[in-house]
Amino acid sequence: MALYRAMMADWREAFKNPDLPFYLVQIAGVAWAGEGADYWRGVRDAQQALMNEEKNVYMTVSYDLSEPDNIHPAKKQPMGERLAAAALANTYGKDVNWRCPTVSSVEIVEDKLILNCDHVSSWHTCDGGEIEGFFFVDRNGKREKASLTARGTSLVCDISENTSAEYIEYSVLNYSYTNLLNEHNLPLTPFKSKF
């Protein structure tokens, strides 16, 4: 991301606008390096850090639009709408919902793992099916599909039988199918958390 930071600094200087906003699309999933690999996670993490650390940098998520063999997914309109909403809210001051949901905290209550989330009032899946894209990960990196249910703004799963799992992750792999959206049809931001 050093090059991205340098580009932003150069453009802000060239346009004589130290607050010039930047809008970026978090890299989509692609199976080039293998469906189970997580090479692109580092890129996504760096993009997230860029948004969190730099002023006037806003990011939208595209993982839900991913295609296994195309780094530039064909579904351009939803991405354009997400970027437009971000610009309307942040550059033009409009009251528009643009933030993708994020996991704000992870807690264990009895035998349940609870993911508390921000920027969501309700959840649904784009295909009407069960929530897809979550995995438990043990200390050796072995992944096992995690089954979650929506409960209000939180996501809940039973961990009573997953005694070796140390992490839960979502949209971390180079490519995996995901279908979870908030009430504004915005996808959950990729994450990995220890519990």
Regions found by a protein language model. Give the residues of each.
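Active-site neighborhood of glycoside hydrolase catalytic domains
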Residues: 1-24, 54-56
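Alpha-helical scaffolding within the catalytic cores
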Residues: 2-10, 38-48
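Hydrophobic, well-ordered secondary-structure elements that form the walls
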Residues: 11, 83, 168
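Generic beta-strand/beta-sheet core signal
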Residues: 23-27, 60-62, 171
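Solvent-exposed loop/turn segments at secondary-structure junctions
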Residues: 28-32, 64-67
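Short glycine/threonine-rich loop-to-helix capping motif typified by GTGT followed
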Residues: 30-40, 73-76
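Catalytic cores of secreted or luminal carbohydrate-active enzymes
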Residues: 44-132
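C-terminal beta-sandwich/jelly-roll accessory domains of carbohydrate-active enzymes
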Residues: 114, 119-195
